[in-house]
Amino acid sequence: MKPSLEDTLLASIRTIPDYPKPGILFRDITTLLGNARAFRRAIDELVHPYAGQKVDKIAGIEARGFILGGAVAHQLSAGFVPIRKKGKLPFDTVRVAYSLEYGLDEMEMHKDGVAPGEKVILVDDLIATGGTAEAAVKLLRQIGADILAACFVIDLPDLGGRAKLEALGVPVRTLIGFEGH
């Protein structure tokens, strides 16, 4: 019998205590990415609700969102658009500032990465507080994207990121939640 999605993900996501600082349980998806069956299953599950729908672009947040988003884009026959930290893209960009734990940062994308009205799915590995994903949503809306959903492998529900995106009217899809961060 095929293991459940939850069992597959639990067996292939490594938890590292006290990284990057004491008290944090870091959820490492590199072990998921290195397991061909688990990686394929995660991508298939992320894609499933959108198969047959018109999806123009997948926007992936640096860095693990590039890996997952590229695979999702391939499966949906959609283009891929990187959302990066400021100063990393070589052409004309649009930029948005967002709050970090200790200050501000900025992310950007190419101005011509998404045309107004194009249907976009935002992809990243994990949603925690939602600050980065919220900034990505604002960036995509700034250039006129129609955001169909935001998809993540992991949700840390105690940190409220999902609710933050849903309050912005963005449907959120996650594959597994870890209570307690």
From Swiss-Prot:
It catalyses: AMP + diphosphate = 5-phospho-alpha-D-ribose 1-diphosphate + adenine. One of its GO terms (molecular function) is adenine binding. Gene3D superfamilies: 3.40.50.2020. Its EC number is 2.4.2.7. One of its GO terms (biological process) is adenine salvage. It is an enzyme of class 2 (transferase). Its main location: cytoplasm. PROSITE patterns: PUR_PYR_PR_TRANSFER. It comes from the Bacteria. GO terms for cellular component: cytoplasm. Keywords: Cytoplasm, Glycosyltransferase, Purine salvage, Transferase. Pathway: Purine metabolism; AMP biosynthesis via salvage pathway; AMP from adenine: step 1/1. Belongs to the purine/pyrimidine phosphoribosyltransferase family. Catalyzes a salvage reaction resulting in the formation of AMP, that is energically less costly than de novo synthesis. HAMAP family: Aden_phosphoribosyltr. PANTHER family: ADENINE PHOSPHORIBOSYLTRANSFERASE. Homodimer. This is Adenine phosphoribosyltransferase. It comes from Mesorhizobium japonicum (strain LMG 29417 / CECT 9101 / MAFF 303099) (Mesorhizobium loti (strain MAFF 303099)). The lineage of its organism: Bacteria, Pseudomonadati, Pseudomonadota, Alphaproteobacteria, Hyphomicrobiales.
